[in-house]
């Protein structure tokens, strides 16, 4: 795991800490948005790591990295993403579809008309090419297949920004911002605006509260990793005991006793383990 000093703005912890910071939050979020959208943005309320829960324990919820609410305007969600696994990339459009659905559902209260739904722009900033065309900007909106020129305005828009894309003649300021987000050093702060952003990033990294939060997140990830390793070791031991016992022709009663002895568990737990490997 990187140290806090080593983090770049494309790391979700840092961009979340920056945009939610009590001093630098709104101005940093505004600069990033205005650079991406190339227009002015109104007063912003930043909701770091906004949660939209599932309807019940059986349904999926989401956690949004940087949720931005423009006063009397649009809703924005900024999602830095470095998870370049094949399955994750293929499912990205469906993931975005779900994000839009949850954001809309969370902002339409009882009695509201559908016409009152606010415009929502979900922005993914990725260090991988989500569609393989080497474009820096992919802007996605719903439309009509039969009549492409038909104006179909449902208020939903998604922008994928590939930090290393070259095709499509992206604006120079956007190229510089995305390069800085992936490599957040003073050497890559090539404009006055980026130098100002870098000063904010540096100040946030030196903030004691941010450092404490990062240390806690590091400890939490370490606990999860160790727990996963322990569970994996235990599962491997369970399977090994059962497979070896079967090879040696041992009866289930003998295997149960061996499981209890080796794993320090009671008979009921041993039976559950044995049943698991008989399925």
Q: Where is each model-derived feature located?
A:
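Short, charged alpha-helical interaction segments and adjacent helix-coil junctions
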Residues: 1-6, 13, 67, 76-81, ...
């Amino acid at each position: 795991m990187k140290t806090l000093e080593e983090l770049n703005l494309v790391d979700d912890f840092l961009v979340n800490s920056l945009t939610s910071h009590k001093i630098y939050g709104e101005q940093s979020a505004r600069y990033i948005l205005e650079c991406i959208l190339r227009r002015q943005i109104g007063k912003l309320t930043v909701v770091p790591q906004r949660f939209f829960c599932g309807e019940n324990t059986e349904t999926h919820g989401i956690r949004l990295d940087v949720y931005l609410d423009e006063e009397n305007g649009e809703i924005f969600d900024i999602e830095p993403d470095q998870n370049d696994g094949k399955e994750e990339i293929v499912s990205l459009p469906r993931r975005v579809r779900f994000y839009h659905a949850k954001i809309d559902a969370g902002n339409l209260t009882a009695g509201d008309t559908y016409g009152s739904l606010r415009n929502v722009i979900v922005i993914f900033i990725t260090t991988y090419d989500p569609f393989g065309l080497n474009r820096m900007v992919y802007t996605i909106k719903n439309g009509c297949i039969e009549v492409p020129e038909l104006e179909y305005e449902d208020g939903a828009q998604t922008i994928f920004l590939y930090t290393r894309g070259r095709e499509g003649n992206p604006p120079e300021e956007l190229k510089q911002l995305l390069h800085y987000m992936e490599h957040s050093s003073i050497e890559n702060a090539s404009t006055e605006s980026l130098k100002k952003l870098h000063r904010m990033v540096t100040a946030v990294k030196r903030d004691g509260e941010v450092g404490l939060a990062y240390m806690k997140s590091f400890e939490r990830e370490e606990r999860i990793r160790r727990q996963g390793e322990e569970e994996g070791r235990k599962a491997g031991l369970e399977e090994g005991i059962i497979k070896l016992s079967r090879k040696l022709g041992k009866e289930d009663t003998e295997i149960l006793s061996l499981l209890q002895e080796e794993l320090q568990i009671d008979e009921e737990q041993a039976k559950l383990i044995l049943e698991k490997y008989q399925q």
